[in-house]
């Protein structure tokens, strides 16, 4: 069986048995510092076999940080694969064994310097279902206070303050195209209009959060 169960994976419905593809065997075709590329032989619903190539990803989180006046914290950073500076909400990948909320708190503090008192899990998205196991948990954060940030070596990030209306205008103009940020905006708009329910919690402060 596969050893790379994706974040957010759920059991298939029995009604979908006629669509299911079953694992036969796996081969690692590339392993870099970050990417793990697999080629799996799979059995199709009709009994024939074929291959699926995909990237194994540890999973990630994204934070929608809300100031008390309703404005939002965003980042601008250069994304080499698309060769442009992207406007995004803070995000980062999970460390091995790290709970998603711990990761969200860590990434927000490291990248922006902000800490949040209250957190709410908005949901999860799978952003590249044809070729990656990556799942991104989206968290809302409020009750922000600004401290110092601690960027990783080789990380260059500008932090800015904006509004949801401005982000929606940027998306409509085609200057904001990051999928996780677009989904976070959509869920935030729905939450503000009482169409997206979340549960707020007050976890221990970052330095008090137990490490796995």
Where are these regions (language model features)?
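Conserved Nudix-box catalytic region and its N-terminal flanking loop in Nudix hydrolases
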Residues: 2-7, 13, 17-20, 52, ...
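Acidic, metal-coordinating catalytic segment for phosphate/diphosphate chemistry
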Residues: 25-62, 68
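Short loop segments at secondary-structure junctions
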Residues: 46, 67-69, 78, 142-146, ...
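Unchanged
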Residues: 50, 59-62, 93-179, 198-212
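Short helix-capping/linker segments at secondary-structure and domain boundaries
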Residues: 188-201
């Amino acid at each position: 069986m596969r050893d790379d169960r994706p974040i957010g994976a759920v059991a298939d419905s029995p009604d979908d048995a006629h669509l299911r593809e079953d694992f036969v065997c796996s081969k690692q075709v590339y392993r870099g510092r970050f990417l793990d590329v697999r080629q799996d032989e799979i059995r199709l619903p009709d009994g024939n076999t074929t291959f699926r190539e995909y990237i194994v990803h540890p999973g990630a989180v994204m934070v929608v940080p809300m100031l008390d006046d309703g404005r939002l914290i965003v980042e601008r950073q250069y994304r080499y694969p698309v060769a442009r500076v992207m406007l995004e909400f803070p995000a980062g990948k999970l460390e091995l064994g790290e709970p998603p909320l711990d990761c969200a708190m860590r990434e927000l503090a490291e990248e922006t310097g902000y800490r949040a008192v209250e957190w709410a899990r908005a949901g999860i998205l799978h952003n590249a279902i044809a070729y990656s196991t990556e799942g991104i948990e989206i968290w809302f954060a409020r009750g922000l206070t600004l401290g110092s940030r601690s960027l990783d070596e080789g990380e260059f990030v500008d932090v800015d303050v904006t509004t949801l209306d401005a982000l929606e205008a940027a998306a409509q103009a085609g200057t904001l195209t990051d999928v996780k940020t677009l989904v976070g905006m959509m869920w935030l708009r729905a939450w503000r209009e009482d169409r997206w329910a979340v549960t707020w919690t007050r976890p221990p402060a970052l330095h008090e959060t137990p490490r796995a």
